């Protein structure tokens, strides 16, 4: 048992987040995403989170993992297909609020890839987390940033 680890994050997912390096990516995939096929073809790690949606996992992951500050948009969604031009994507507003809570760039940190470009980027991911999310166009790719040193940590060590 550990303190301050969101309960949604499995030990395997926490391990994957720890093993990821700067600029590595993780896919938070909805229930319809071909995660198993992509992971199998690329040798990527596939983790299951069937009982959870993408928004709650996004919130839990960003509590631990910083977003990359060396790129303008470290969070990427899948663009709507032309046939879905008129389709509302309400989960986007949820993502904007969650990202803004953890990153000062807010909604500006969120970009999009065309559908097939998204699949190509997903093939490069360190890890794919397949969720039970049923919202349309709910897939995300997150790019990991760097952990900043805690200046108070050394001071605490010196007290002992």
Q: Residue locations for each model-derived region?
A:
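Gly/Ser/Thr-rich active-site loops/lids in small-molecule metabolic enzymes
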Residues: 44-61, 153
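Glycine-rich, aromatic-bearing surface loops/beta-hairpins
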Residues: 82-160
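Short, solvent-exposed amphipathic alpha-helical segments in soluble enzyme
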Residues: 32, 37, 42-44, 62, ...
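Long, hydrophobic N-terminal alpha-helical segment
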Residues: 1-50
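Structural motif
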Residues: 24-27, 43-46, 68-77, 106-109, ...
